[in-house]
Amino acid sequence: MSPNIRPFIAGNWKMNGTVESLGELRAIAAGVSSDLGHLFEALICVPATLLSRASDALSGENLLLGGQNCHFDDCGPYTGDISAFMLKEAGASHVIIGHSERRTVYQESDAIVCAKVQAAWRAGLVALICVGETLEERTSNKVFNVLTRQLEGSLPDGATAENVIIAYEPVWAIGTGNSPTSAVVAEVHDFIRHKMCSRFGDDGRKMRLLYGGSVKPSNAFELLSTVHVNGALIGGASLKAIDFLTICDVYRKL
C-alpha cells in the first residue's frame, strides 16, 4: 500500500459473461456498497455487449463499470471495433488499454496503446494501462528495459493521477496460477513509481499502481500489502462475487 492513495480494485471479465451474469455483478455491487465501499474504489470491466445492461442494472450503485479495449479513432470504417465514445455512452468510466493479451494476440504496439489512451481521454474515460514482461524477458534480465520502453511509449504527455491508472501484469503470471513474490512485485512497483515521478512529478507520486496476474483470495493479502501496490487488476477471480469480495475484504485488515 501507499499512504494517501485510495486503493482501487478492478475486475476484468475478458470474454466471459452473459445477461445471466448480471446477478454476480449485482452481488459485487451490493458488497462494495456496504461498509467495504469507503475503503477503496471498485471497477468491473465487462464485455461490451453487457455494458449498457450493466449500467442500467447498477444505476446508483458505487461499483464502476469499464470497457476492455477501444479503438484509437473516434469513429470510422473499422468493422467490429468499438470507440471510447461508444463505451462512455454505454456507461463506462474506465477502459483497459494495452492488456498483454491485446499486445501479443493482436500485436498492439506501444504507439497503438498510446493512441488508444488519447482516444480514451477525448471521451472522458480513465485509461487503465497495462505493462509487463514475458517469462523470456524476465529470465533474460530484460524486465526493466521492457518496462521502460512500455511506460515511455504507452503513456502520452498529459497523464495525471486522475486520467491514468497503471497495472503491472507479468505476462507469465496471467491465468497460470503463478504469481511473483511480494519482493519482486515491490521491486517492480518501486521502479514504476520512480519512472512516473521522474516524468510527471506530483501526479506521478499520486498515480495508482495496480498489480495484476493470478490475484486470488489466497494471495491477496500478501500482494495488496506490498509497498507501492495500490490495488489489483483481477481476472478469473472477478467472475464470482464471493471471490472478488473476499479479495476486497483484505482492505479491512490493512
UniProtKB/Swiss-Prot annotation:
GO terms for molecular function: triose-phosphate isomerase activity. Substrate binds at N12, W13, K14, G175, S214, G235, G236. It catalyses: D-glyceraldehyde 3-phosphate = dihydroxyacetone phosphate. Keywords: Cytoplasm, Gluconeogenesis, Glycolysis, Isomerase. GO terms for biological process: gluconeogenesis; glyceraldehyde-3-phosphate biosynthetic process; glycerol catabolic process; glycolytic process. The active site is at H99 (electrophile), E169 (proton acceptor). GO terms for cellular component: cytosol. InterPro entries: Aldolase_TIM (IPR013785), TIM_sf (IPR035990), TrioseP_Isoase_bac/euk (IPR022896), Triosephosphate_isomerase (IPR000652), Triosephosphate_isomerase_AS (IPR020861). Pathway: Carbohydrate biosynthesis; gluconeogenesis; Carbohydrate degradation; glycolysis; D-glyceraldehyde 3-phosphate from glycerone phosphate: step 1/1. It is found in: Cytoplasm. It holds the Pfam family TIM. Belongs to the triosephosphate isomerase family. Involved in the gluconeogenesis. Catalyzes stereospecifically the conversion of dihydroxyacetone phosphate (DHAP) to D-glyceraldehyde-3-phosphate (G3P). This is Triosephosphate isomerase.
